Amino acid sequence: MQDQLGREINLKATPQRIVCLVPSLTELLVDLGLSDRLVGVTKFCVHPENLRKQKTVVGGTKSIHADRIAALKPDFILCNKEENTQEIVEICAQIAPVYVSDINDFDSFYHFVNDLGALLNCLPKAETLNATVKERLFQFRISVNSEPVRNVLYLIWKNPLMAAGKATFINVLLNECGFKNVIKEGNSRYPEVDSELLKKADYVLLSSEPFPFSEKHIAEFETQTKAKIICVDGEYFSWYGSRLLKAFDYFEKLLTEIN
């Protein structure tokens, strides 16, 4: 099998000692019933809540303790193209087989979950999760079908001011919610933006991650634009694991509040 970057994955047996360097995918592994096989996580793997107390924390998503990972004797390491650096992937590949995910839309999400199910011998649960997400997405699309299109700017960082571009999973979910990203095609995935772009939006969404935007930042942006400023939970817009099972309820509530 190949991972989503086309790298060959060669496993001698079904993995029993997994290290995951992607917070959203750590949550996914647990929801697939694989918590007992999970031995190492990052400091940002905050879901489930007490997991970090039960597993070995091996660093962050951009900086790892390779010695800690090696000491765990993992037989499978899960990374992500966007969350982790190429250097981290190369270091981990010297320790155990590494699967690098690259999830930019629902099709790549479904493909990844099926891969995980096959590699980790939990395919029935993986297929059930995919089917549930597909059904929930279908229902959500029906509920927002009559929503007006709203121009939106989704901010992820403050200094410099940065937004989610169109080639992101965040943008896919914005579109599903009836939003149109004011970032132009061809820009980087997370371009720097200026105050002029703020003025083109009907709504400016302040994400709770990676920069921890909160209510205290709203007034500052209200002086720069007539757009409605709203704080949103970034996990529901950017976590592409089993968090999607809860995301559509969150989006429905958000759209109700906007209306």
Language-model segments: residues:
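N-terminal ligand-binding lobe of clamshell/alpha-beta domains
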Residues: 1-259
